[in-house]
């Protein structure tokens, strides 16, 4: 099977080019000032122009207002909106309708109880992203390099595609895919040398490892 690869939190031309050239299907840009991966509108516009149509552009926001989302859409012209906050299924549905763009909702996972709202989110979003639930004192909801128990997703069946993120690296991506059978994988801190500092060789290594794992999946 072909796995959708998303490299998230890109903020420089060089690392963005490395991701696109290596075959990333999606490239993500963070619009959240508390994140070390945050990009402003001018930079987002320049990076979006660099991508062109070579990969899908994803805009990550956290509990954003319609006004902020409109500015994000104007700057990046994203192909997908990633909602990484505590947006309700109703809010997800409203954003999808207002902006006319597909939406991916992040679902934070620590225990099986965290999957209780999954049917409602799967009915509202076009895609689900499972990420590790951050510690209570965390200042941001993702990109912390912490995995969750992938076995919680074993045997999962959803009406929409889903991706997995959280503590995934070139060294464990094959195992993450084997356990979850996810159709997509999302990496941020796993291809960094420091928070927010992407590494081109780690990006290439991650994509190579993901493509190699496809050969063992049916």
From Swiss-Prot:
Catalysis: reaction(s): N-(5-phospho-beta-D-ribosyl)anthranilate = 1-(2-carboxyphenylamino)-1-deoxy-D-ribulose 5-phosphate
InterPro entries to which the protein is assigned, alphabetical: Aldolase_TIM, PRAI_dom, RibuloseP-bd_barrel, TrpF_fam
Annotated organism of origin: Rhodopseudomonas palustris (strain HaA2)
HAMAP family reported in the protein's UniProt record: PRAI
An example Gene Ontology molecular-function term: phosphoribosylanthranilate isomerase activity
Family in the record: Belongs to the TrpF family.
Pathway this chain belongs to: Amino-acid biosynthesis; L-tryptophan biosynthesis; L-tryptophan from chorismate: step 3/5
Gene: trpF
Any one GO biological process: L-tryptophan biosynthetic process
Keyword Manganese among UniProt keywords: no
EC number: 5.3.1.24
Taxonomy, superkingdom: Bacteria
Bilayer-spanning residue ranges: none
Main enzyme class: isomerase
Keywords, ordered alphabetically: Amino-acid biosynthesis, Aromatic amino acid biosynthesis, Isomerase, Tryptophan biosynthesis
Pfam families: PRAI
Protein's recorded name: N-(5'-phosphoribosyl)anthranilate isomerase
């Amino acid at each position: 099977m072909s796995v959708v690869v998303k490299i998230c939190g890109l903020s420089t031309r060089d690392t963005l080019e490395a991701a696109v050239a290596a075959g990333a299907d999606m490239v993500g840009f963070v619009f959240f000032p508390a994140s070390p991966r945050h990009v402003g509108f001018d930079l987002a516009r320049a990076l979006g122009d660099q991508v062109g149509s070579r990969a899908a552009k994803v805009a990550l926001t956290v509990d954003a207002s319609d006004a902020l989302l409109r500015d994000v859409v104007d700057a990046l012209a994203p192909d997908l909106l990633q909602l990484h906050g505590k947006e309700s299924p109703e809010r997800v549905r409203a954003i999808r309708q207002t902006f006319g763009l597909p939406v991916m909702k992040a679902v934070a996972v620590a225990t099986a109880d965290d999957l209780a709202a999954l049917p409602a989110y799967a009915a509202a979003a076009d895609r689900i992203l499972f990420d590790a639930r951050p510690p209570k004192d965390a200042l941001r909801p993702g990109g912390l390099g912490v995995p969750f128990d992938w076995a919680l997703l074993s045997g999962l069946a959803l009406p929409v595609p889903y991706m997995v993120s959280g503590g995934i690296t070139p060294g464990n991506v094959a195992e993450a895919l084997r356990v979850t059978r996810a159709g997509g994988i999302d990496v941020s801190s796993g291809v960094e040398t420091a928070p927010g500092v992407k590494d081109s060789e780690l990006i290439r290594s991650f994509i190579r490892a993901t493509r190699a794992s496809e050969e063992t999946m049916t």
